[in-house]
Curated annotation (Swiss-Prot):
Keyword Coiled coil assigned: no
Major subcellular site: host cell
Pfam families, alphabetized: Corona_7
Subcellular location per the Swiss-Prot or TrEMBL entry: Host membrane
Function: May function in the formation of membrane-bound replication complexes or in the assembly of the virus.
Signal peptide: 1-23
An example Gene Ontology CC term for this record: membrane
Membrane-topology descriptor: Single-pass membrane protein
Transmembrane portions of the chain: 81-101
Protein name: Non-structural protein 7a
Family recorded in the similarity comment: Belongs to the coronaviruses ns7/ns7a protein family.
Amino acid sequence: MLVFLHAVFVTVLILLLIGRLQLLERLLLNHSLNLKTVNNVLGVTDTGLKVNCLQLLKPDCLDFNILYRSLAETRLLKVVLRVIFLVLLGFCCHRLLVTLF
C-alpha cells in the first residue's frame, strides 16, 4: 500500500511539472513571436542597426537558436515526463487491481 501511495504522489508531481513545462513553452513561444514581430516591423536592411534596435527592446535574448533550442528541450522534457506519467499510472492501476482482487 505504501508503494502505491508513493507512486500516486510521484504521478501528481509529474502532472504538476508537465503543467509548468507547458507554461514555460508558451512563454518561450510568446517571446519568440515578439522578437520575430519586432524583426519584421523594423525591416531594416542593415543588420547592425536591426541588432541595436533589438538590443534596446529585448536585451536578454537575441539569439534565436538558443531560444529554439530551449523550446525543443522543453518539448522533449514534456514528452519524457508524459511517458513516465503513463508508466506510473499503469503501475498504480496494476497495484490497485492486485490489492482489490
